[in-house]
Every structure is written in structure tokens, then in C-alpha cells.
């Protein structure tokens, strides 16, 4: 994968090979699912969101401090957030556990950032490496949410910033009812037509519906050690941007 050699410069940590670091069947199935839809993943996201997810990701990039370096975009998928981050930061790296997603990103050539296949629960980076970490629509797919957030905390520099974009639930009841119908009926149908994998677009809305959002997720961020947390709802609560900082060194 182009640019992986740059990891040596930033610090490399070999994940421990113990019983807790081995991926379970559930994680393997999710990886295969994303691999199966990788080729048309970006197109499908644009159709299903009516293009608004591009605006959401632009807002994520704007939350990263200007000139921050280096920056990790975890669960990067095909890397569509990377060019936005490169416009603001130096030393951007994209990481994801799904190789077909990364290959799609590499072939499309959106970014010059190195792409790294990695497990979010055992990140292959040294402690205190990144000035900022972004995650767009990825944390809800982690097998162990708190462990994944703790790993992000570990690889961040003291004072570093975390920015997460994730789906939520609309706050206004009538809109929530329409959105839930759309997610349950329309998304699997369109997703199935575009990718040939209806099951994936049944699974993804279900994870969004069951994931803690708003203040509930913000509390989890504080629980694992982040401070100065905040959350902002987008498009009536369909998505949220979360922020947190690793405490600065005393």
C-alpha cells in the first residue's frame, strides 16, 4: 500500500498477540460485508443521503485545528475525508480494517495520504502519536466501543483533539418516524439495488438506531478519559459531531 513506510517515521507499535487481540467472528463478518460493498459504497452513500454527508464531513474537517500534525482518520473507508483533512493538516494518515475499501481509495487517487490496514481495537501506532484523530461513521461498528475509544485516546498526543461523526436519532418525533421508515424500508432497497447487498443496508441502519447518541455518547467519551467534550446535532439529529480532547500533560 502506497505510503505505509511513513509509519516508521511516526512510530510503530506491534499489537500484542494474545487471546484478547484476535478478531472475533462478528468483526470478521462486518469486514467482509464492507468489502463486498466497497466498489459502490461512495455512490450509495451519496444517493441515500442526497449528498448531505459531504457537507457533514466538511464540517468534521473544519473542527480539526489548522496545521495539526500528524492526523489519523480512523475507519477511513475509501478515504473521502482525507483530502479535506489535508487542506488543513500535515501528515494525514488513513486507517481502516477493510482492505478492499482502502484499495478503492488508493485506485481513485483522491489523496496522497498513506493508507494503513489496521484494527481499531489494537492500533499499530506508538503512544502519543497524533495531534488529532477523526472518525466518520465508524465507531458504531466497533466490536468493543470503549476499548476502541481507549485506543484512540492512547495514540493521541496530550492536548490532542478527537472529532467523531456518527449517526443518531432525530429529536422531533414526527421526523423521527419518517426517518425510521426511510431507514427500514427505502435504504435496504436502494442499497441492495446499487450494491447487490441488501443485507448490508439492513444492518447499517440498525446499528445507527441502537447506537447511543447525543449526551449518552458524550458521557462515554468522558468515561474513557476525554475532556472538554461537546456534541452538535446535524440535520435534525440524523447525525452528530462529537468533540473531545486528551487531557494536556501536567
Where are these regions (language model features)?
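A short glycine-rich, Lys/Arg-flanked "PGG" loop and its adjoining helix->strand segment in the class I
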Residues: 146-158
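A short SAM/SAH-binding and catalytic strip from SAM-dependent methyltransferases
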Residues: 131-145
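Core SAM-dependent methyltransferase catalytic element
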Residues: 224-227, 233-250
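Class I SAM-dependent methyltransferase SAM/SAH-binding core
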Residues: 70-122
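Conserved alpha-helix/loop element of class I SAM-dependent methyltransferases that forms part
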Residues: 50-68
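C-terminal alpha-helical "lid/dimerization" subdomain adjacent to the S-adenosyl-L-methionine
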Residues: 168-220, 224, 230
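Conserved beta-strand signature within the Rossmann-like core of class I S-adenosyl-L-methionine
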Residues: 160-167
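A short acidic, Gly/Pro-enriched loop at the edge of an enzyme's catalytic core
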Residues: 121-132
Amino acid at each position: 500500500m502506497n505510503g505505509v513506510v511513513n509509519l516508521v517515521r511516526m512510530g510503530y507499535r506491534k499489537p500484542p498477540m494474545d487471546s484478547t487481540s484476535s478478531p472475533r467472528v462478528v468483526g470478521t463478518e462486518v469486514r467482509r460485508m464492507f468489502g463486498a460493498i466497497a466498489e459502490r459504497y461512495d455512490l450509495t452513500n451519496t444517493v441515500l443521503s442526497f449528498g448531505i454527508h459531504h457537507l457533514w464531513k466538511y464540517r468534521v474537517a473544519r473542527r480539526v485545528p489548522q496545521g495539526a500534525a500528524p492526523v489519523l482518520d480512523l475507519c477511513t473507508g475509501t478515504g473521502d475525508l482525507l483530502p479535506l483533512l489535508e487542506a488543513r493538516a500535515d501528515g494525514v494518515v488513513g486507517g481502516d480494517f477493510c482492505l478492499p475499501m482502502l484499495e478503492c481509495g488508493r485506485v481513485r487517487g483522491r489523496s496522497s495520504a498513506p493508507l494503513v490496514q489496521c484494527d481499531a481495537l489494537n492500533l499499530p501506532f506508538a503512544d502519543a502519536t497524533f495531534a488529532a484523530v477523526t472518525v466518520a461513521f465508524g465507531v458504531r461498528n466497533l466490536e468493543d466501543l470503549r476499548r476502541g475509544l481507549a485506543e484512540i485516546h492512547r495514540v493521541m498526543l496530550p492536548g490532542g483533539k478527537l472529532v467523531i461523526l456518527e449517526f443518531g436519532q432525530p429529536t422531533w418525533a414526527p421526523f423521527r418516524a419518517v426517518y425510521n421508515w426511510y431507514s427500514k424500508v427505502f435504504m435496504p432497497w436502494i442499497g441492495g439495488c446499487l450494491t447487490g447487498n441488501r443485507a448490508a443496508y439492513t444492518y447499517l441502519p440498525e446499528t445507527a438506531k441502537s447506537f447511543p447518541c447525543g449526551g449518552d455518547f458524550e458521557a462515554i467519551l468522558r468515561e474513557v478519559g476525554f475532556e472538554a467534550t461537546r456534541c452538535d446535532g446535524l440535520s435534525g439529529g440524523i447525525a452528530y459531531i462529537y468533540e473531545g480532547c486528551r487531557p494536556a500533560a501536567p
